[in-house]
Amino acid sequence: MIVIGDIHAEYTQYLKLLSRYPGQSSVQIGDFGIGFRQVPELPEGAWFFRGNHDNPELAREHPHYLGDYGVRELDGVKFFWVSGAWSIDQQYRTEGVSWWRDEELSYAELEQAVDLYEKERPDLVLTHDGPNVATDFILNRYSLHKTKPIPTRTGQALDAMWSIHHPKKWIFGHWHVNWKQEIEGTEFRCLGELGWCEVNKEKK
């Protein structure tokens, strides 16, 4: 299974990447760009969930949308995912055109997602943003912001998940850097724009 970072409606490059892996499933982990440009026909097995730069309504209507959160198995790889994030640049965007008020899941939806996470205790987690234990490393290493971004309900939910259970792998995007580090037994990986990685079924 291929996991792909933010593409921001760069569909030509996205489809070119998918063509290198015919027959393999893929999951694009948010900031797909739906709502900014017409989405081309996607190959079978190409899935995505939304980030903070996606139109939530259009995403939910698309046949290749995984859903807002849940558990799925593709190519023998089982994973848990959560959509959405908070936009630090929303003051520069236009509501309903380039920014959507429901970019994050609601508190109730996130609470349900945390409950499902606790029940499933997954080995692999895919999210658009990452928990603070990982994003703090990125902020410090790359000096992305002079001040730490404000706490968000998505971030708080991801932190709650991390406190409940440490998965083997956690892959996210949002921060536009390629970064990987093991923290307390979890291999965290941030995918940059059009970054990707392959996740294989674990051998028993």
Question: Where do the model's predicted regions map?
Answer:
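Core catalytic region of metal-dependent phosphoesterases/phosphodiesterases
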Residues: I2-D75, T152-G155
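Active-site neighborhood of phospho(di)ester-bond hydrolases with catalytic His/Asp-centered motifs
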Residues: V3-G5, S26-D31, A46-H53, L66-G67, ...
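Glycine-rich, phosphate-binding/catalytic loops in enzymes
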Residues: R20-Y21, L42-E44, R141-H145, E187-R189
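Binuclear metal-dependent phosphoesterase catalytic core
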Residues: R72-G76, D159-I164, H176-K204
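Active-site-proximal loop/helix segment associated with metal-binding centers of metalloenzymes
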Residues: D75-R153
